[in-house]
Structures are given as structure tokens and as C-alpha cells.
């Protein structure tokens, strides 16, 4: 029986509806961790004020590239910008690893008929978190590099590696072996993966648009809300990809 996107979408939404409480809690918890880590590692207000003093210069330099804008900063401002970027990247990476590990564990446990909470899912996922961390670090690096060179290569890399977290979690194989398997399966089933990835990207862009419309909320609360909504979108994509992989799962994989 052929695999259809409609069937996968229906299964994914059914799972989301049945496990909504656990998924919402997981999305909120990982969003809170992400925001708290970012607040802990971001430079202090005095340093940020030094960086924000250049905002008017950036606004008047609309035709310059990012590289040229950074080159115009003083060495002190460049160091502060690097700290801000590193804090945001690290906190987002940790939050995403916990979200992916917890979600994949939750999906796996529920598929086996076991009920688990969001906290239990994260706890059970601890053994696979180091491999997920390495995998997502490499994947993020490659995708960002592809987007920097040109947007299309970044999207292609994202599609190629989309199944690798599920493979690492379910097959307990190494990071690079999981990436290799993901590339083969993803390109062989690109018609089922690309539409879901495009919907995921579109949802993320809509959330970015909403950033400027949550000015009534304090910044930390707005950050948690937006991060939780973003995590919820990613959770739905993970359910879709997990279900797809279970239907495509090769029989010759050695665990």
C-alpha cells in the first residue's frame, strides 16, 4: 500500500490531539529552558547598550551586507556581538536537543502503549541526548553554511538530514551512519518530506512576523510564548517524520 501525505498528516494531527497536554508541557518546558539559558549567558545591559548604540548606523546602511556591517563595528562591539550570537545559538541548541529527545521518546513510548509525561520523556531520553547534541550541532552548522552560501543548499541539507534524529533515537546507531541513512531515505521520498518541511518553514516565518506584535508582554514572557509555539510546530513535524520513518524503516539495519 503506497504511503500518502494525507495519511501521514491525519495520523500526525490525531497523535497531537491525543497527546496535546504532554506535548504542550514539553514545548513550554524546553522554551523556558531556552530563554533562561539565553538570559544567563547573554552579556549584561551595559555591554548591550554599547552594541545597541550602532542601531541607527545599521538602519542608514541598508545596502551593505552583513559582513560589511560587522566590519564597521569596533573590536569591542564585535566581541559583544559574538557573545550575543553564541548565547543565542547555545541556548537554542540545548532547547532543541531536549525537545527532540523528549518528543521522540514520547512518540516511541506512546506507540508501545506506555503513558509517559513530558518530564519522564526527557528523563528517559537522557542516554541519547549526547548523540542528538552532536548530530544537531553538525546539522545546524551545515544548514547555516548552506543558507549563507545560498538559500537552496541550506533547504536541501535540511531535507537530507530530516530523518537523522529519528534514526539516532530508534536505531541507536552512530551520528554519521544515521546521517548517511537519512540522506538515502529522504531523497528517495522527497515528495513526502518537502511539503511538510515547507509548511514547517512557513509556520516559523509567521511566528517571526508575530515577534513585533507582542510588545504588550514583557520580553522574557514574549520570548517563552513564541519559543513554545515554535516548539509546538517542530513537535508536529517530528511526529510526521517519525511516522514516515516507521513506514519506510529498512529491515537490514543493525542496531
Swiss-Prot record:
Lipid bilayer topology: Multi-pass membrane protein
Transmembrane segments: 22-42, 90-110, 118-138, 141-161, 192-212, 221-241
Signal peptide: none
A single GO cellular-component term on record: plasma membrane
Keywords carried by this UniProt record: Cell inner membrane, Cell membrane, Membrane, Transmembrane, Transmembrane helix
Coiled-coil residue windows: none
Keyword Transmembrane: yes
Compartments, as annotated in UniProt: Cell inner membrane
First-listed, main subcellular location of the protein, grouped into a coarse class: membrane
Pfam family membership, one: UPF0259
HAMAP family attached to this UniProt entry: UPF0259
Family: Belongs to the UPF0259 family.
Protein name as catalogued: UPF0259 membrane protein YE2218
Organism the protein comes from: Yersinia enterocolitica serotype O:8 / biotype 1B (strain NCTC 13174 / 8081)
Amino acid at each position: 500500500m503506497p504511503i500518502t501525505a494525507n495519511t501521514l498528516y491525519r495520523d500526525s494531527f490525531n497523535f497531537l490531539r491525543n497527546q496535546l497536554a504532554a506535548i504542550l508541557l514539553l514545548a513550554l518546558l524546553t522554551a523556558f529552558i531556552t530563554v533562561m539559558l539565553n538570559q544567563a549567558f547573554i552579556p549584561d545591559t551595559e555591554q548591550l547598550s554599547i552594541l545597541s548604540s550602532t542601531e541607527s548606523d545599521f538602519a542608514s546602511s541598508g545596502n551593505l551586507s552583513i559582513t560589511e556591517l560587522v566590519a564597521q563595528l569596533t573590536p569591542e562591539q564585535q566581541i559583544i556581538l559574538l557573545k550575543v550570537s553564541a548565547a543565542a545559538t547555545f541556548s537554542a541548541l540545548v532547547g532543541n536537543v531536549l525537545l527532540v529527545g523528549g518528543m521522540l521518546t514520547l512518540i516511541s513510548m506512546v506507540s508501545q502503549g506506555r503513558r509517559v509525561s513530558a518530564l519522564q520523556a526527557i528523563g528517559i531520553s537522557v542516554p541519547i541526548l549526547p548523540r542528538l547534541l552532536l548530530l544537531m550541532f553538525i546539522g545546524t552548522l551545515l544548514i547555516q553554511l548552506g543558507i549563507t552560501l545560498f538559500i537552496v543548499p541550506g533547504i536541501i541539507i535540511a531535507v537530507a538530514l530530516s530523518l537523522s534524529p529519528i534514526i539516532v533515537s530508534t536505531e541507536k546507531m552512530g551520528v554519521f551512519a544515521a546521517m548517511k541513512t537519512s540522506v538515502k531515505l529522504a531523497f528517495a521520498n522527497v515528495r513526502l518530506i518537502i511539503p511538510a518541511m515547507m509548511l514547517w518553514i512557513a509556520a516559523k516565518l509567521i511566528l517571526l512576523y508575530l515577534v513585533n506584535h507582542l510588545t504588550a508582554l514583557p520580553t522574557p514572557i514574549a520570548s517563552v510564548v513564541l519559543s513554545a509555539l515554535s516548539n509546538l510546530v517542530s513537535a508536529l513535524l517530528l511526529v510526521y517524520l517519525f511516522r514516515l520513518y516507521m513506514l519506510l524503516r529498512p529491515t537490514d539495519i543493525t542496531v
